[in-house]
């Protein structure tokens, strides 16, 4: 390789790094998207809304059988996220890495087992 070609390619590579937004690469004050867990919350009544803002996670889906809770949960999210009435649809969503279950206690067992079978943490 000629020195001129080497310098051109080196400069192009260095310039490309300055074009990439900071939030994509991570670093101080920024988490790269690949280092962030995406989560879904099943049950977005009073308890479920407390699960919205955990560090290192990004909310991508919510689920509730009560339409009023679901609508309020979507408003609280403040961004476009998936909304489901059936928890099985949420746990089968390929965009969801982890699931928070904030339903009445008698539902936790079956939902946890189904989430584990679907490969969700």
How would you name each of these model-derived features?
Residues 1-121:
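N-terminal glycine-/serine-/threonine-rich beta1-alpha1-beta2 phosphate-ribose binding loop
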């Amino acid at each position: 390789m000629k020195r001129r070609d080497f310098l051109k390619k080196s400069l192009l590579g260095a310039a490309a790094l300055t074009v990439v937004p900071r939030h994509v690469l991570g670093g101080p004050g920024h988490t790269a998207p690949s280092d962030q867990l995406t989560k879904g919350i099943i049950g977005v009544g009073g308890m479920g809304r407390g699960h919205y803002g955990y560090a290192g996670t990004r909310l991508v889906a919510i689920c509730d059988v009560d339409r009023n809770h679901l609508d309020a949960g979507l408003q609280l999210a403040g961004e476009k996220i998936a909304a489901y009435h059936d928890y099985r649809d949420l746990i089968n969503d390929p965009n969801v890495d982890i699931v928070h279950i904030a339903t009445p206690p008698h539902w936790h067992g079956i939902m946890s087992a189904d989430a584990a079978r679907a490969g969700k943490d």
